[in-house]
Swiss-Prot record:
The lineage of its organism: Bacteria, Bacillati, Bacillota, Bacilli, Lactobacillales. This is one of the proteins that bind and probably mediate the attachment of the 5S RNA into the large ribosomal subunit, where it forms part of the central protuberance. In the 70S ribosome it contacts protein S13 of the 30S subunit (bridge B1b), connecting the 2 subunits; this bridge is implicated in subunit movement. Contacts the P site tRNA; the 5S rRNA and some of its associated proteins might help stabilize positioning of ribosome-bound tRNAs. HAMAP family: Ribosomal_uL5_B. PANTHER family: 60S RIBOSOMAL PROTEIN L11-RELATED. This is Large ribosomal subunit protein uL5. One of its GO terms (molecular function) is rRNA binding. One of its GO terms (cellular component) is ribonucleoprotein complex.
Amino acid sequence: MASYLAEEYKEKVAPALAEKFDYKSSMQIPKIDKIVLNMGVGDAVSNAKNLDEAVEELTLISGQKPLITKAKKSIANFRLREGMSIGAKVTLRGDRMYDFLYKLINVSLPRVRDFRGVSTRSFDGRGNYTLGVKEQLIFLEIDFDKVNRTRGLDIVIVTTANTDEEARELLTQFGMPFAR
């Protein structure tokens, strides 16, 4: 069974975008390609257990096993060597992607303290949107009592839109709460 947002895209979002931007072909209509979750764990250099906790939390949040990211080059000031594990990332596609986006928009973002909407300035000029979350506790899957320290994560929503305006309209149609 397809995800709720996937159905919503086919029935409402795609036709609305086609009408607003006057696309000639259905292949021109922007859609969400993937969502990438990245958690940088800088203190994993001194304590590898911190990375394991981050991987476990990212697994709970995303529903799939993260890829551990390695340092590309050595930096002496950070006591960092090339090839050391310093973070974790997950790429979501398909139904998992739509399920995560639904959860993010309707459950997790409203749990952020003093939430007034996400920034409209976080588009990259090519139709992709980046969102930073300061603490992982906004996700329901994370048990508050088992968290040793709060960690932030980056959420990148990659779309097939050519412009930021198209991507903003796509995410607005999905219900992304942009700040006024």
